[in-house]
Amino acid sequence: MTRNNFSGAAAHSARSIWRNGRLATLREDLQGLGIVENGAVVCEGGRILFAGPEGELPAELIENTEITDLEGRWVTPGLVDCHTHIVYGGNRAREFEMRLQGATYEEIARAGGGIVSSVKATNALSVEGLVEAALPRLDTLISEGVTTVEIKSGYGLNIEAELKMLCAARALEQIRPVRVVTSYLGAHATPVEYKGRNGDYISEVVLPGLERAHAEGLVDAVDGFCEGIAFSVDEIRRVFDKARSLGIPVKLHAEQLSNLGGAKLAASYGALSADHLEYLDEDGARAMAAAGTVAVLLPGAFYAINEKQKPPVEALRQAGVHIAIATDSNPGTSPLTSLLLTMNMSATLFRLTVEECIAGATREGARALGLLAETGTIEAGKSADLAIWNIESPAELVYRIGFNPLHAHIFKGRRID
């Protein structure tokens, strides 16, 4: 995937060495977390030149180099939040109260709440207003070591507003030390004026909006919501056909509230990921594995809507599907801006292992964005995106609740305190 250069905090050009660290590299050619004791990382020009045991550090890399002693701290890849909706206006606190009174997510949506209720507040804001509203959410993610974040549109539901959201996402990348990947989510919900006319909405808004987003360089992937309260398999297929014709990768919200066959549809298009998946079946898992489609699990949404059906984690494991996790940060069903808490939720609610949680928030998150060649592991040739932690073992990142042990993080070779 082609990425724009980050200009808000340019890559650090000078060579630097981070030594005396305990590296959880997440390299796939190593077992478990890919741990390297007494490790060192050499960065130059925003890239990793060397990552491995300090004793194997080539002498020529040490000359004329800035050296930082990590004092035995743990180092992981920078975290990757691969599914968010952090650009929006307003909030949905009233719906939170409704859920406490017994209303379900589907009942709220059918009554005109849910996604559609965020549209008015979002449409009322300018690009600058959306950036201002999103910054506290993004800053909270960055404060926990996130160096890559995916941001979706989907609260505009008209062409200009969807493009405005994507412009805001691109703007965030220019003013914060983070890599932003954008997803066009025009097929998120049907606006009131198109109620009962999903096909017309796709023809008149979603598809031409996608063409414009692509022409203006605003979209890295195309997403959709395949669900009874949103869009059918056939309707999403129209969107994915357009994405394919434009050469844009796809992903899908699938099997969250029911099984419509969205995961199989996503797999048939070689989707980067299928997300949520509470109602995924074994056939869907096998299709995803065959296509290399990543399962993105979203425990924040599961928790917030008090869902009872859990994603079939064991079926995903048995099929060999890569598993990522993400905050799904959004105003209604996952008002969550902590990837660390997401790790704990993934373990506690979905019974993922510590290794799966950490991999899910680093390597597999990068895989779900088509960025594994760029980030997500600590190895030579990749972007120098690192998180440095004040912990005794990596398990603490998953085990602790309401705890941020980040010492510092590095984005494209530049230290961010």
From Swiss-Prot:
It is an enzyme of class 3 (hydrolase). SUPFAM superfamilies: Composite domain of metallo-dependent hydrolases, Metallo-dependent hydrolases. It is found in: Cytoplasm. Zn(2+) binds at residues 83, 85, 253, 328. Binds 1 zinc or iron ion per subunit. GO terms for biological process: L-histidine catabolic process to glutamate and formamide; L-histidine catabolic process to glutamate and formate. Its cofactor is Zn(2+); Fe(3+). Signal peptide: none annotated. Fe(3+) binds at residues 83, 85, 253, 328. 4-imidazolone-5-propanoate binds at residues 92, 155, 188, 256, 333. Pathway: Amino-acid degradation; L-histidine degradation into L-glutamate; N-formimidoyl-L-glutamate from L-histidine: step 3/3. N-formimidoyl-L-glutamate binds at residues 155, 330, 332. Its main location: cytoplasm. Its EC number is 3.5.2.7. One of its GO terms (molecular function) is imidazolonepropionase activity. One of its GO terms (cellular component) is cytoplasm. Keywords: Cytoplasm, Histidine metabolism, Hydrolase, Iron, Metal-binding, Zinc. It catalyses: 4-imidazolone-5-propanoate + H2O = N-formimidoyl-L-glutamate. Belongs to the metallo-dependent hydrolases superfamily. HutI family. Catalyzes the hydrolytic cleavage of the carbon-nitrogen bond in imidazolone-5-propanoate to yield N-formimidoyl-L-glutamate. It is the third step in the universal histidine degradation pathway. This is Imidazolonepropionase. It comes from Chelativorans sp. (strain BNC1).
